[in-house]
From Swiss-Prot:
Keywords: Ribonucleoprotein, Ribosomal protein, RNA-binding, rRNA-binding. Pfam families: Ribosomal_S18. This is Small ribosomal subunit protein bS18. The lineage of its organism: Bacteria, Pseudomonadati, Pseudomonadota, Gammaproteobacteria, Alteromonadales. One of its GO terms (cellular component) is cytosolic small ribosomal subunit. GO terms for molecular function: small ribosomal subunit rRNA binding; structural constituent of ribosome. Belongs to the bacterial ribosomal protein bS18 family.
């Protein structure tokens, strides 16, 4: 049987030494939402709980200010 080796998940924000996730940083936030607009869970991305909470808060603020869409385009 072949064994599959998964890449170890790590928190990018901890590695880079980020103190606060900013809602205006749309390029970073887009990496953590799906095509349909859902927030990707930390078990998929490997983000720490502290940064996952900040990430969710930043995404919700960006959505409220219409910097990010709530859903996809519904075509």
């Amino acid at each position: 049987m072949a064994r599959y080796f998964r890449r170890r998940k790590f928190c990018r924000f901890t590695a880079e030494g980020v103190t606060e996730i900013d809602y205006k940083d749309i390029a970073t936030l887009k990496n953590y939402i799906t095509e349909s607009g859902k927030i990707v869970p930390s078990r998929i991305t490997g983000t720490n709980a502290k940064y996952q909470r900040q990430l969710a808060r930043a995404i919700k603020r960006a959505r409220y200010l219409s910097l990010l869409p709530y859903t996809d385009l519904h075509q």
